[in-house]
Design a protein with these regions (language model features):
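Cyclic nucleotide-binding regulatory module and flanking cytosolic helices
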Residues: 2-49, 93, 98-99
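Alpha-helix N-cap/helix-start motif at coil-to-helix transitions, marked by capping-box chemistry
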Residues: 11, 29-32, 36, 64, ...
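Residue-level recognition of specific faces of alpha-helices
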Residues: 20-26, 37, 62-65, 84-87, ...
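Cyclic nucleotide-binding regulatory domains
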Residues: 26, 51-114
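Histidine kinase transmitter module recognition
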Residues: 27, 45, 76, 97, ...
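Polybasic "coupling" helices that flank or enter modular domains
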Residues: 112, 130-175
């Protein structure tokens, strides 16, 4: 039940999208005009619980922002064991790396609840970044924060005993 609007937004819809964007760290400090330019490239997508958004190895065509619901990012081992890498909730972007790297999605993304997502196509978003250095700086800060979280998680999982690792990992997933 994927329902993209492909960037054709009426004025009221653009205002609603702008309102959501203005509350996200990634877009903080941008002008109304910049937010409207971003809103014009956004596609709104709705997914049911348990629906796959993309698979490990799919072409990285853009990134997403969670508006409602939760999305898990995970890898599957050859024997089918699932390793959750991250859980994203409202206001959190995900799958940004392929936009800049020109690569494929490095993991699977699946909805944990009914979800509303905004999709930012790679080509349109890269053009906006080239025109708006402040957007590029916000994106860099967002990716740096995520790198810091993963670094902390690796430290926790590799340096603690099993009960401590489990407790720390459960706390990490609850954030």
């Amino acid at each position: 039940m994927n329902k993209p609007l492909r960037g054709h937004h009426n004025k009221a819809n653009t205002m609603e999208i702008r309102q959501h964007l203005s509350q996200v760290d990634l877009f903080k400090g941008l002008t109304v005009e910049q937010l409207d330019a971003i809103a014009r490239i956004v596609s709104e997508k709705k997914y049911k619980r348990g629906q796959l958004i993309f698979s490990d190895g799919d072409e990285g065509t853009g990134f997403y922002l969670v508006i409602k619901g939760r999305v898990k990012i995970y890898k599957l081992s050859p024997d089918g064991k699932e390793q959750i890498m991250h859980i994203f909730g409202p206001g959190q972007p995900f799958a940004e790396v392929p936009v800049f790297e020109g690569s494929r999605y490095p993991a699977n993304a699946e909805t944990m609840d009914s979800c509303e997502l905004y999709f930012f196509p790679k080509k349109g978003f890269v053009s906006l970044i080239q025109e708006n250095p402040s957007l590029a700086m916000n994106m860099l800060a967002s990716l740096s924060q995520r790198l810091k979280q993963f670094s902390h998680l690796i430290e926790i999982l590799s340096l603690k005993e099993v009960p401590g690792r489990l407790a720390s990992y459960l706390l990490y997933l609850s954030d």
